Amino acid sequence: MANIKSAKKRIKVIETKTLRNKVIKSKVKTLVKKVEVAVAASDKDLATKSLKDAVVAIDKAASKGVYHKKNAARKVGRLAKAVNSIA
Protein backbone atom coordinates (compact mmCIF):
# COMPACT_ATOMS: atom_id res chain seq x y z
CA MET A 1 0.00 0.00 0.00
CA ALA A 2 1.20 3.46 -0.87
CA ASN A 3 2.23 5.85 1.88
CA ILE A 4 2.63 9.00 -0.22
CA LYS A 5 -0.52 11.11 -0.57
CA SER A 6 -0.22 11.54 -4.34
CA ALA A 7 0.29 7.79 -4.80
CA LYS A 8 -2.87 7.09 -2.80
CA LYS A 9 -4.76 9.51 -5.02
CA ARG A 10 -3.40 7.86 -8.17
CA ILE A 11 -4.65 4.48 -6.93
CA LYS A 12 -8.17 5.91 -6.48
CA VAL A 13 -8.08 7.62 -9.87
CA ILE A 14 -6.88 4.46 -11.62
CA GLU A 15 -9.65 2.40 -10.02
CA THR A 16 -12.25 4.92 -11.20
CA LYS A 17 -10.87 5.02 -14.74
CA THR A 18 -10.55 1.23 -14.91
CA LEU A 19 -14.20 0.85 -13.97
CA ARG A 20 -15.27 3.41 -16.59
CA ASN A 21 -13.16 1.73 -19.26
CA LYS A 22 -14.65 -1.69 -18.44
CA VAL A 23 -18.18 -0.33 -18.80
CA ILE A 24 -17.39 1.30 -22.14
CA LYS A 25 -15.54 -1.75 -23.51
CA SER A 26 -18.37 -4.03 -22.44
CA LYS A 27 -20.91 -1.86 -24.26
CA VAL A 28 -18.78 -1.84 -27.41
CA LYS A 29 -18.35 -5.63 -27.31
CA THR A 30 -22.11 -6.11 -26.93
CA LEU A 31 -22.85 -3.87 -29.92
CA VAL A 32 -20.17 -5.58 -32.03
CA LYS A 33 -21.70 -8.97 -31.22
CA LYS A 34 -25.11 -7.69 -32.36
CA VAL A 35 -23.60 -6.75 -35.72
CA GLU A 36 -21.85 -10.12 -36.05
CA VAL A 37 -25.05 -12.03 -35.22
CA ALA A 38 -27.00 -10.01 -37.80
CA VAL A 39 -24.29 -10.67 -40.42
CA ALA A 40 -24.32 -14.40 -39.62
CA ALA A 41 -28.11 -14.40 -40.07
CA SER A 42 -27.76 -12.40 -43.34
CA ASP A 43 -30.15 -9.76 -42.00
CA LYS A 44 -29.04 -6.66 -43.95
CA ASP A 45 -31.44 -4.20 -42.26
CA LEU A 46 -30.59 -5.26 -38.71
CA ALA A 47 -26.88 -5.40 -39.54
CA THR A 48 -26.90 -1.87 -40.95
CA LYS A 49 -28.80 -0.48 -37.96
CA SER A 50 -26.56 -2.32 -35.51
CA LEU A 51 -23.48 -1.11 -37.38
CA LYS A 52 -24.49 2.52 -36.90
CA ASP A 53 -24.93 1.99 -33.16
CA ALA A 54 -21.60 0.16 -32.91
CA VAL A 55 -19.73 2.86 -34.86
CA VAL A 56 -21.05 5.59 -32.56
CA ALA A 57 -20.00 3.63 -29.45
CA ILE A 58 -16.55 2.80 -30.87
CA ASP A 59 -15.89 6.41 -31.91
CA LYS A 60 -16.96 7.70 -28.49
CA ALA A 61 -14.67 5.18 -26.81
CA ALA A 62 -11.80 6.32 -29.03
CA SER A 63 -12.44 9.99 -28.25
CA LYS A 64 -12.40 9.19 -24.51
CA GLY A 65 -9.10 7.36 -24.84
CA VAL A 66 -10.44 3.88 -24.14
CA TYR A 67 -9.30 2.71 -27.59
CA HIS A 68 -6.53 4.14 -29.75
CA LYS A 69 -8.02 5.93 -32.77
CA LYS A 70 -6.41 3.52 -35.25
CA ASN A 71 -7.66 0.53 -33.25
CA ALA A 72 -11.16 2.04 -33.40
CA ALA A 73 -10.84 2.68 -37.14
CA ARG A 74 -9.77 -0.94 -37.66
CA LYS A 75 -12.76 -2.23 -35.69
CA VAL A 76 -15.17 -0.04 -37.66
CA GLY A 77 -13.60 -1.05 -40.97
CA ARG A 78 -13.86 -4.76 -40.24
CA LEU A 79 -17.50 -4.43 -39.16
CA ALA A 80 -18.39 -2.36 -42.24
CA LYS A 81 -16.67 -4.90 -44.48
CA ALA A 82 -18.66 -7.72 -42.87
CA VAL A 83 -21.96 -5.85 -43.29
CA ASN A 84 -21.18 -5.00 -46.92
CA SER A 85 -20.43 -8.66 -47.64
CA ILE A 86 -24.09 -9.57 -47.09
CA ALA A 87 -25.62 -10.23 -50.50
Curated annotation (Swiss-Prot):
SUPFAM superfamilies to which the protein is assigned, alphabetical: Ribosomal protein S20 (SSF46992)
A GO MF label: small ribosomal subunit rRNA binding
GO cellular component: small ribosomal subunit
Keywords of the record: Ribonucleoprotein, Ribosomal protein, RNA-binding, rRNA-binding
UniProt record, GO biological process: translation
Keyword rRNA-binding: yes
Family: Belongs to the bacterial ribosomal protein bS20 family.
Function: Binds directly to 16S ribosomal RNA.
Protein name per Swiss-Prot or TrEMBL: Small ribosomal subunit protein bS20
Gene (name only): rpsT
